[in-house]
Amino acid sequence: MVRFIEENTKLVEKETGNKSNNDVTTTKKKALQDIIINNGVGLINSWVDSMRACSPTHLKSLLKQSSWLTEHPSALDMFEEILHLSEGKQIVMFLDYDGTLSPIVDDPDRAFMSRKMRRTVRKLANCFPTAIVSGRCIEKVYNFVKLTELYYAGSHGMDIKGPEQGSKYEQILQDSKSLLCQPATEFLPMIDEVYHKLVEKTKSTPGAQVENNKFCVSVHFRRVDENNWSDLANQVRSVMKDYPKLRLTQGRKVLEVRPIIKWDKGKALEFLLESLGYANCTDVFPLYIGDDRTDEDAFKVLRERRQGLGILVSKFPKETSASYSLQEPDEVMEFLQRLVEWKQLRSGA
């Protein structure tokens, strides 16, 4: 366990101009990197374009939508196929929170999950080992979910804790209460410092909201007029240029400041599988459901392991490593309910 953490938390070497094409998959990612690492002031417009690309608000053509659904069919339509793939294997559930268990809302402090969704997740955790993997800090996501029997991976997997009580799977761990993984602890003072600087720097931009998620800082621009995105990008860049050990990633109308370490939601998934005793098992079937770019790290891990599958929550066609799709949290709940019903029937409950 300790070796797993040590091998995956080394600082990433500072990237140079000799970087291979494989390291950057899109021009937009390259533009973002140039702005943050190379102080590319002239590329702010490209960054804003990338912000738009990460926050789709318009319908794609029906032809493109149809083509995308052919490659990433509905997990509800393909439910029997998913069950067939999992036959004889232990299903382990990994769920993002915002946009997956709760709707995306303008005010991130009001991203409440419904009581019906909470009941569904509680039943799910009674059937399968279940983890919430979120960009929010553990304390915030727990205050939304309010289920002690789950595993929680906050701050994009940089803060992991086991269930406090009630999970029938906690016996798998030698001592689930001691399960704790915080690979970025040394960055806490730096993250806190950047948080306060970003609050001060962005206060002139109406609608901007800076959130301290313990091991990362989120700059929400969902309520920022698009005409002001460029100003906000400049404000964030002016702070980030003084912190080469931090990196910036993007999500659905949010900019995320994180330590440059080899740790993400994919690493969190692997850590939890190892903690549960499934690291080298062939009879385990991880199911990861998420809606954001940061969930792609977990989708890619599952593809590389050739084990389990990813389900993207999106109404719009997106480039993704997920195998299936669901359109919104209501569909996620229906999928989870069907999983629970299937398991209960199999168990004779």
From Swiss-Prot:
One of its GO terms (molecular function) is trehalose-phosphatase activity. Keywords: Hydrolase, Stress response. Pathway: Glycan biosynthesis; trehalose biosynthesis. Its EC number is 3.1.3.12. Pfam families: Trehalose_PPase (PF02358). Induction: By trehalose. Coiled coil: none annotated. It catalyses: alpha,alpha-trehalose 6-phosphate + H2O = alpha,alpha-trehalose + phosphate. GO terms for biological process: trehalose biosynthetic process. Belongs to the trehalose phosphatase family. Removes the phosphate from trehalose 6-phosphate to produce free trehalose. Trehalose accumulation in plant may improve abiotic stress tolerance. This is Probable trehalose-phosphate phosphatase H.
